């Protein structure tokens, strides 16, 4: 296994290795963003869920660590505009990192394809300089396709992570929206 990796490294085009290194950096970054945001959103959703539960059990106001509490403290009256501002700010905060995952999901296959094209061009150049047997062609194309496979691999994770975080963000926004509606109905302003 290690010998195969060393052979691949020694025989591959520099651009292909650069593409694989770039995709590795992409993969590390998207995993960091995903796990950081996932655990942050989980913690946030738990706080909002507890605050909503307290409201539904008769509490007059949201919990002090609930997102809307910051907006409620700044105003003497509860109104829809104040809560709309809070909802917008919460949605913006909850969706942080999604654009990075989206960019990685859409660009990773193209980066891999770029490495493949350059590697295939290098293979054709080597075929022109030597007697091109089928073994030389197959080996060159095989090495070239590794970059595309790596790009698709990274994109699959980025897209999956994007969808998971998008759903978690929607959950947090929904919990905040329910708190807003409960507060407005208690104050007589309606939702």
Which positions does each model-derived feature cover?
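Alpha-helical transmembrane segments
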Residues: 22-32, 111-114, 118-121, 155, ...
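Alpha-helical membrane-interface segments at transmembrane helix boundaries
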Residues: 6-13, 91-105, 138-146
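Transmembrane alpha-helix/interfacial motif
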Residues: 8-50
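Predominantly long cytosolic amphipathic alpha-helical stalk/bundle segments
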Residues: 39-133, 160-191
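Hydrophobic alpha-helical transmembrane segments of polytopic membrane proteins
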Residues: 144-160
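Residue-level signature of catalytic and energy-coupling elements of molecular machines
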Residues: 13, 31, 109-112, 141, ...
